[in-house]
Each structure stands twice: as C-alpha cells, then as structure tokens.
Amino acid sequence: MRQFSYVLLLGFVLAFIAFQARTGIFRRKNPGEPANKYMRQMMESPQLSEDDAAILMQKYPTAHSNPSGLRYVVRAPGEGAPVPAGAELTVHYTGAFLSTGAKFDSSYDRGQPYTFRVGAGTVIKGWDEAFATMRRGEKRTLIIPYWLAYGETGRGTIPPRASLVFEVELVDYH
C-alpha cells in the first residue's frame, strides 16, 4: 500500500508540472531573447566587421571614439563656439569606403559646398552627431560605422553594411 501511495503522489506531481507547463505559467515572456541583460545588449549593439576594425586600428589609431561608434580625428581646429542646435551648415567633404579607400563622392570635385540643417535628420546620423560638436573652419576625418551611415541596406552606390570615411570641413554656419 505504501508503494502505491508513492506512485500516486509521483503521478500527481508529474501531472501538476505538465499542467503548469501546458498553461504557460513557466514560459518566458520573450523566449527568443537571451535571458540576461548583458547578452541581450551584446546581441543588439552593432559591431564592425573584423576587417573594418583592423583597418581602423591600422589607419586611425589615435581617433577619438564616441559611445555611438562614431570616430574622428581633428585635422585642423576651428574657431568660435560649437554649432548651435538646428543651425544651417555649409560644409565641404570627400567620402570614401573604409574597406577599400575608394572615393564615392566629393563636394570639392563639384566645386560647390553642401548645405544642410544639423539635427534635422536630412543627412546620415554620423554627420548629425559629428557636425554638432564642430567649430567654424574645423577640419576632421570622420570614420562612420555602417549603423550611423546607410545601415544594413545601403543606398545607391553605397553597399549594405559599408563603413565610411569622410574628410570634412565646416566652412560656415548660421
């Protein structure tokens, strides 16, 4: 009789566990996501390819790095106050691919500077972030990772996940 009660108790326990699992009480809210916060952040934060990271360390070892992933080297300091929010900027630039160094665009070649409003979202995120801290006349080399440039899809002649290098000059703002 005693053995029968153990088997009966074990049966009830297994039935209870099966019922709980079936109703979803023990299910995670997001089963496809990692369980801990650190793993989730690592999966969500974009990373440079190994090739791009190697080129970056070789060509730009002294580049300043922002938390967003934007890197820059100040080539010539500017004068005056930093760009105010919402200012209209006049800039010259030459854009190239980090991976190959091939130039894809240049306002210098056209002989006409480019004008845009900082922070309005009309240019790539890396430009909005970089130009917001520059001063009139300043020249920088911007190393912009793909997630601050044209992203996972690319655009026009820019392929997907392309990290870019810009030689920029803040000519004026108002």
Where do the PLM segments sit?
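Cross-family detector of peptidyl-prolyl cis-trans isomerase
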Residues: M1-H174
